[in-house]
Amino acid sequence: MLTSKKEMQSSENKQEENLALLLTNYISYQNIVIFTGGNQFKIRNKKEFTEYTIESNSLFFLAKNTHWDMEIVGIDNSNPYRKIIIDDALIKLLHSISSDDSCYVKKKIFTANLNEMQLNIVSNIITDIKYSGNNKKIFKILYLLSFFNDYNDIVNVILSASSKSIVDRVIKVIELDISKNWKLGDVSSSMFMSDSCLRKQLNKENLTFKKIMLDIKMKHASLFLRTTDKNIDEISCLVGFNSTSYFIKVFKEYYNTTPKKYNGVYSITQGTLP
């Protein structure tokens, strides 16, 4: 069957609209729960030869400091994904209500498929979380975790990674001024460590200082694009790039699209990756 040029172009445009994000070596620096919304997530761990396809309107949990290749395919752009962070307040509560005999869990990703009734409940919970105060928010997130069959394993994963890591401390310093082009020596000095000691500690986490810097700057760049009316030149400057053209190049390599197309093609208005 012959396909007209117009039909081929329409098909190509549809495919382009459906491709949301393509992230290589994505690192979740915090324990997170993601509601997929109108997106399909394809997640791979090349080191462990594992692959997961998580359909739209589902939940999944990613453990802190784990490495993934991730593709997000937008099926319904009017229904963006949502990211919920497991913060320190919730971790503190989990410590207070959990027994001391928590065990190590090797698995680092958990999924939950939702029926129609559960989907309605989860949607309401996520909306409530956004507008709730800290105490109410904590219990809403706990309720959200209860939709996972592996709830106990997830709690153990969260507790096992609850201590502040060297990566957390590095991120905290960098985010004091994301417009600054931090050097390893700047950060190690502020942490009262030698350069070599900090480098070794990051190597133990399979990370480099350069990788963390890139992830933090790209996270904030995507946030500025989606939550402000700042232009690309302004955003480039805010995240520490002296050249807008170089910022666009780096952004495109990271997110597989240009900053200009990022908002137009991807209706991801809640949460951000990384």
From Swiss-Prot:
Pfam families: HTH_18 (PF12833). PROSITE patterns: HTH_ARAC_FAMILY_1, HTH_ARAC_FAMILY_2. Residues 185-206, 232-255 bind DNA. Residues 168-265 form the HTH araC/xylS-type domain. InterPro entries: Homeodomain-like_sf, HTH_AraC, HTH_AraC-typ_CS, Tscrpt_reg_AraC-type_HTH. Could help in the transcriptional activator of eaeA expression in enteropathogenic E.coli. However, it seems that it is PerC which acts as an activator. PANTHER family: ARAC-FAMILY TRANSCRIPTIONAL REGULATOR (PTHR43280), HTH-TYPE TRANSCRIPTIONAL REGULATOR APPY-RELATED (PTHR43280:SF33). This is Transcriptional activator PerA. It comes from Escherichia coli O127:H6 (strain E2348/69 / EPEC). The gene is perA.
